[in-house]
Amino acid sequence: MGEIATEFTPVMDDDDDRCVVPEVELTVPKTDDSTLPVLTFRMWVLGIGACIVLSFINQFFWYRTMPLSITGISAQIAVVPLGHLMARVLPTKRFLEGTRFQFTLNPGAFNVKEHVLITIFANSGAGSVYATHILSAIKLYYKRSLPFLPAFLVMITTQILGFGWAGLFRKHLVEPGEMWWPSNLVQVSLFGALHEKEKKSRGGMSRTQFFLIVLVASFAYYIFPGYLFTMLTSISWVCWLNPKSILVNQLGSGEHGLGIGSIGFDWVTISAYLGSPLASPLFASVNVAIGFVLVMYIVTPVCYWLNIYDAKTFPIFSSQLFMGNGSRYDVLSIIDSKFHLDRVVYSRTGSINMSTFFAVTYGLGFATLSATIVHVLVFNGSDLWKQTRGAFQKNKKMDIHTRIMKKNYREVPLWWFLVILLLNIALIMFISVHYNATVQLPWWGVLLACAIAISFTPLIGVIAATTNQAPGLNIITEYVIGYIYPERPVANMCFKVYGYISMTQALTFISDFKLGHYMKIPPRSMFMAQVAGTLVAVVVYTGTAWWLMEEIPHLCDTSLLPSDSQWTCPMDRVFFDASVIWGLVGPRRVFGDLGEYSNVNWFFLVGAIAPLLVWLATKMFPAQTWIAKIHIPVLVGATAMMPPATAVNFTSWLIVAFIFGHFIFKYRRVWWTKYNYVLSGGLDAGSAFMTILLFLALGRKGIEVQWWGNSGDRDTCPLASCPTAKGVVVKGCPVF
C-alpha cells in the first residue's frame, strides 16, 4: 500500500520549528501519522473517477464566454461521503495474504492521505490541457482538417514534458520554507475542516459547519448570475448614465471597455482568470492593482485618445485583428495551400492592425519577460545559488515540514524524472519528423523549446511560489520561433506549447508536490498519482474537445453564432490571433523593421530597468520595508490574462482581495485563520455544482428566461467596441 513507516511524528512548537511564512505557520499542521495507508483501492477508484469528471466538465466549459474553471476543491469535497461510504461497505478481506502482493479493498477508515491523493487526481482534471488551443485554432479558425493521432500525441507530450523540469527543480521550489505556494493553503485548510475532530466554541461554529453553510448559500445564489439574472456577471452602471455615448460606454463597460465602476456579483467572474482572491497575499494583490490601474486607466486611454497607431479606428479593448479601415481582417485569405503565408495576397491585403489595449498588453509581455529575469537575479539570485550549493550538503537547517518528510519517507529518485524526460523528448522528435506536414516544427525547434523551458522554470517558479502569480512568458517562445521560422502558424503554436506550457505544467506538478509536502504524503505515492492523473486527463480532454467541435454548430465563430451565445471561445480567439501575429505573418512584419509596432520593443528595456531601480531603492532606503514589496514582474504582468480576461474580472477580484487580504487579515485575524480558505473552497464548490446542474437540467434543452436582466449585451454597453475615428463604418455604430 505504498511507503509505510511505523511512527507518529509530533513536533514541538519551538523557535527552530516555526515556519518563516506566517500564513503557513497558522494553517499547516506540524504532525504526521506515517502509518496511514495511502495507495488504497478506493483512492484509485475515486481519484480516477474525479479526474475523468473534472476533465470533461472543464473542457466543456472552456469554450464558453465566461469559462468556468471547476477546481479540484469541488472533487475534494464531493468524495468525502463516498470515501466514508466505501469504508463502511467494502469487504475487509485480505487477498494474497502472506505474500508481498497482499492487499485489501478496505484497509479501514477513510483517511486524509487517501483524500489528498484523490485531490491530486482531481487537480490533474482541473488543470487545462493548453494544447487543445492548437486543435481549436486549426479546426475552428483556420478551417483545416487535422488527423487525430498527431493531435493526441502533441497533447500528451506537452503535459508529460513538464515532469522532467519538475524533477530537476523540485528540491529548490518545494523543500525551502520560503517557497510556500499560497494557493495550496486553501486545500490544506479544507482538508483540516473535512477531517479534524473539531470542537465547536461557544457561540461559534466548526470549520465543517461553516463550509457547509457557504456551500449551500453559494449553490443557491448562483442560480441568479448563472441563469435567472446574468447581468449580475458584469454590472456596468456607468453606461446607464448616457447609453448613447461611445465615450461613456468605453469608460464604463466591464467586458469591452475600461470597466470604471464595473463590478460582478458572481464568484465565477471574480475567480475566472486570477484564481481565488482569498488565496492571494496582500503584497501580490497590491502589485496587481497598481499594474491594472497603470495599464487600464493611464496607458491605454492616453494611447487611445492620442490616436497612437490609429487607435481610434479600432475598439479601445479587443483581441480581434483588423484591417487599416477598421474592418475585421480576413486571415484565411492570406494562407496558401501549404498552410504558409501567401505573400502576394498579404501585400495586397495590407498589414495587420490591433486595438490599443492589445498592443499594450504585448508590450507588457515583453517587459514581463525581461523584468522576471532581472528581478530573480537581483532579489533571489544569491538564495538560489546557496540552495544549489547546499543541495549536496548535510546537516543544513531545514524547514520543519521538510525535516518530517525526509525522516519518514523515501524521496523520488531523480532518474525517474530523467527517464520520463528523455523518452518524452524522443517521442516529440519523432512527431516533428514523421508528422512534419501537420506540426510544421523541425527537430531543432524541439530542442530549442526545451532549452527555453529549462531556463525559465526556476525563475518563474520562485515568483509563483512566493506571490501566487506566475507571469506569462509565452511571448518569448512565440517571438523566437517567429523570427527563426516564420510564416508557419502550426510550428509557432507547437513551439509555444513545448517551450512555455511544459514549464507551466512543471510548476503545477511542483505545486502539487508542495501540497503533498504540507500534508505529509509519501513522495513516491504522489509521483504515481500525478503521472496516472495526467495520462487520464489528457485522454478525456482530447476526446471532449474533439466531440464538442463536431457537436456544436459554429463553435467559436462569433460571425455565425447568436449574439447571446455562450460558445464564443474567448481564450481560443486570443490564441488564434497570436498564431497569426507570431506564426503566420511573423513578428518581423508586426513588431520588427517591416511592422507598424516596432516601438513596442522598448518595453523590453523598461522591464529590465524597473527591477534594478526597485533593488537600488531598497539599498538606499533600508528602513522603508514597503519598497521591497514592489514586485515588478507581478506588477507589469498583472494584465497578462487580458484579453481574454476583461476589466470586470480584475475590478471584482481586487475588491475581494483587499477586503480579505487586508481588513479581515488585519482586524479579524482569528476569523481569517479559521475560515478564510474554507470560505474560498465553499464558494468554488457551490458555484461549480450549480453550474453543472443548470446545464444538465436546463442548458442542454435550451430552456431560457427572456427579460432585460438576461439580454445578449450583459453589461449594457452596446457602443463600447465602436471606433471613434472619422469615416469608419462598423455595423451598429454611429459614423463620425
Curated annotation (Swiss-Prot):
GO terms for molecular function: oligopeptide transmembrane transporter activity. It is a multi-pass membrane protein. Pfam families: OPT (PF03169). GO terms for biological process: protein transport. Signal peptide: none annotated. Keywords: Membrane, Peptide transport, Protein transport, Transmembrane, Transmembrane helix, Transport. The chain crosses the membrane at residues 43-63, 66-86, 116-136, 148-168, 210-230, 258-278, 288-308, 357-377, 412-432, 443-463, 489-511, 527-547, 602-622, 645-665, 678-698. Involved in the translocation of tetra- and pentapeptides across the cellular membrane in an energy-dependent manner. Also involved in transport of glutathione derivatives and metal complexes, and may be involved in stress resistance. PANTHER family: ISP4 LIKE PROTEIN. It is found in: Membrane. This is Oligopeptide transporter 6. Induction: Induced by primisulfuron and abscisic acid, and weakly by 2,4-dichlorophenoxyacetic acid (2,4-D). Not induced by salicylic acid, hydrogen peroxide, reduced and oxidized glutathione or cadmium. Expressed in flowers and roots, and at a low level in leaves and stems. Detected in the cambial zone of the vascular bundles and in the region of lateral root initiation. Low expression in the vascular network of the petals and high in the stamen filaments and the gynoecium. Belongs to the oligopeptide OPT transporter (TC 2.A.67.1) family. GO terms for cellular component: membrane.
